[in-house]
Amino acid sequence: MTGPAPSALRPEHPVARPLAQLVALFGLDVRGDLDGVEVTGAALASSAVEPGDLYVGVPGRNAHGAAYAAAAAEAGAVAVLTDGDGADLAAAAGLPIVVTADPRAALGAVAAWIHRTEDNAATLFGVTGTNGKTSVVYLLYAILGQLGIVAGLTSTAERRIGEHAITSTLTTPEATELHALLARMREEGVRAAAIEVSAQALSRHRVDGIEFDVAGFTNLSHDHLDDYTAMPDYFAAKLELFQPDRARRGVVTVDSEWGHRLVEQSRIPVTTLSSVAGSEADWRVTVLEETLARTAFALEGPGGRLLETSVPLLGAYNASNAALAIVMLVESGYDLDAIGAALERDGGIDAYIPGRAERLSGDRGPVVFIDYGHTPDAFSSTLAALRRVTAGRIVMVFGADGDRDITKRAEMGAIAARGADAVVITDFHPRWEDPATIRAALLEGARNAVPERDLYEVPDPRTAFRTALSLAGEGDVVLYAGPGHEDYQEAAGERIPYSARDDARLALREAGWL
């Protein structure tokens, strides 16, 4: 690929396929004439339709997608795939209609057929877990690059084809977009791709039609209980990735009971990994040295196999993330010695992960990190890592998502108060919630945990970061947790431009530290 990355992640040279073949293959009902109708793509939103697309109308929270069939037809859609109710809504658009009981459940197989991704030659890695998914995906991508392999990725932060990046909107794309992306990667000669797989993606059929060569599991902790009523339900969604129709092999981090439970219930062969001393896991990772800039570690496997390297990231948890990436590569057929030689040549893993323990400061003043961590476990891991390598104070800035899991807020506040010397609570993405209500829950958790802790409530994130910076000096650390790579703040139905990274750099320059 030359020039800028495409705005649409689709193959440049799609092959038209007769829609009648799809109907016959899947035994679907038809309303209208399919004679001569050929499809080159599929779209789940009328705004994403391109000429030649099959428009897929599914029931939504507020409206049925089939109600927008006329707009899809105007954009160039050649047919509609929907359910019975949707067929009635789409009739006036004048397009042939293919009917199935559950169009979302059919979407992965349909998109795979349209884009011919069932015969994809690339090695596919799928990574799931509460924390660390994005990091492992980027570490896989980085190590593959150091091995000379043209790689791709899709993550919460961005989609990558080779060296070209496009901003993401979902952790895992809808099946229509994901299969189109894989087809484009095939055109670009991508030999391996790492895909971040959320629990919601598994529950909502976004990765249907894909068989991963290796699935990886990082951990499971409190999150998304607005989508899943209890932790066992959340776990069950993750477990779906470790089924024979999803993946050939798995690598599971067993540092928690959830990891052990996953090994017991997995229906594919799994290899285990642990950072716990004395563990009987197949692979064991041991931290050799931690600094604010890097973490050196040793990875020991079956038969005495050993690799020592480093990752340019803070914390033992990132050593575990890197180890998971390496073991996933080994399980897919890459040679451990070849991996070790490439990493030794380059002085360790050469990875940049946007918004994940990303250092923004220079050589003077406090050290400033921005991190996407937004769960109690992520807060705990990052603060513990900082405390081990920080001589001075830790000042933490954070908020919480509105209209998301409210049950974790008090615990987030408590962990921040226990782990930091000063805490600044601000607004993150309030969405339709009252921001003051969100801040109050975080403050209550912090006050109850450590009543004497220095707490500041500063609604505006720009002012909040500058407040944190005013509390820190040489030898101190400022951790801005939550915004990560994002360049907006979502409030009352609007996405307001705001990059915490850019603003932090500006504030550091204003203070004369950058």
UniProtKB/Swiss-Prot annotation:
It is found in: Cytoplasm. It holds the Pfam family Mur_ligase. Its EC number is 6.3.2.-. Pathway: Cell wall biogenesis; peptidoglycan biosynthesis. InterPro entries: Mur-like_cat_sf, Mur_ligase_C, Mur_ligase_C_dom_sf, Mur_ligase_cen, Mur_ligase_N, MurE/MurF_N, UDP-N-AcMur-Glu-dNH2Pim_ligase. One of its GO terms (biological process) is cell division. Keywords: ATP-binding, Cell cycle, Cell division, Cell shape, Cell wall biogenesis/degradation, Cytoplasm, Ligase, Nucleotide-binding, Peptidoglycan synthesis. One of its GO terms (cellular component) is cytoplasm. GO terms for molecular function: acid-amino acid ligase activity; ATP binding; magnesium ion binding. NCBIfam families: murE. This is UDP-N-acetylmuramyl-tripeptide synthetase. The lineage of its organism: Bacteria, Bacillati, Actinomycetota, Actinomycetes, Micrococcales. The gene is murE.
